[in-house]
């Protein structure tokens, strides 16, 4: 063994030790934060939405903005700005306060109250299968499970979600396998292992009927590809079960494909193409766009025999999507043959949830992010292979245990100041079964690196996505773009992206939902995500595939109701 090999091994061992110490400190701080003062940052980014100049938008959408009354529950408070293509969602959810006492003198009482409350709720959850739901008495109703006020009388308030009763029929056993849950809905997850052009093996999951009994099952469904965020898998689109976007759109008649980037839960590669350890982790978002996303799109289109698909992505997945659409000439320059204009020619509708195009103020405020930014290029600190590999070792040992999911949640809350206020509490532990995943240190350098010779997301997003330059030179070739921007998301700057579309992309067919009370992850896991995100998506996709004229959508859409199996299940519950 040469000197360089010994040095590299020593460096990797030291980096592992440093990361373990770092994670231990974060865990202690996260637990203290959770039990003493669990916090949710309700601020937005410092960027203001600028829509005052009426002359900036010189054309209207192909699909005029529509009201969502036909699909949404009555309490949604929506403000429509048709000229600028924005729906402002001002809806406020009535939430149960976890502590009724305030002040430092009641600290111990608060801790005891939290402990006792969680113990009682856990006992009630275990008994709920055998106990019926009784109106007029305290019960383990869906309102309690959804972290809302327990109901003593059935009074219609904001938190009365008609789909909440679906939670009562969910299996709360923790199993890190989507098939375990979806088989209970008569859906099978078909799994594909695909090899990218540069030799990495990635996962693609397909929702299909468990039992094919009718001719309608064989009808061609329009394909939807879903792509996950950083350190997640596409299980994040489905972990809500019957209240997930994946399930809802599947039951609404669409062909759902869950795409996963390299390296996932099980890193795998073609050793002939990727022979060395260094090459196995020598990739970042550019390779994920050029190889992973293109392979996922090509595979879905080949298997469904459609020319175009709908891409729905979250967080990092939106970065991949916009990188491909805006910079496709850099990935596949003119003369690239079949790859030329790859993304604009194969994506019909692009739906971005919590779009990560510009960095938010949280990246400059959080101490741990500042530390990572400073040391991310230092191989003695984070190594040069898998980022925080200790997380994956712990996951492989502990996934499926409620303690593991709880720890993941507390760290998540501590680092980003988001919490489960708007989630279905009973499903919280399930969400963390499908994360984290392996990512490379080089990918994290792409996100955070301060190196002036590199273009990173934190310091160079203006170069990748220039604010005042049109991204689509030929708007007729651009897909329909739908943005769901959470106002309480400080990890990214969604308001800056809104300003770009309103003030620069006037010829592109876009539509924006700006949701006051949502944070970065609520766009996937909020208790009312179907009403506020799923049904607007469904409405616009139905409009696209039915090819109805835009004038048909100037009313409140009362004549375009779609009854989905999800709603029928909710009525039975």
From Swiss-Prot:
Transport recorded as keyword: no
Intervals, Cytoplasmic compartment: 1-12, 34-573
Intramembrane bits: 13-33
Reported induction: Under heme-deficiency conditions. Heme-deficient induction requires ROX3.
Pfam families: Abhydro_lipase (PF04083)
GO cellular component, one term: lipid droplet
Catalytic class of the enzyme: hydrolase
Membrane topology category: Peripheral membrane protein
Note: Present with 7770 molecules/cell in log phase SD medium.
Function of the protein: Mediates the hydrolysis of steryl esters, thereby playing a central role in lipid metabolism. Under heme-deficient conditions, it constitutes the major steryl ester hydrolase, suggesting that it plays a central role in mobilization of steryl esters under anaerobic conditions.
Protein name according to UniProt: Sterol esterase 1
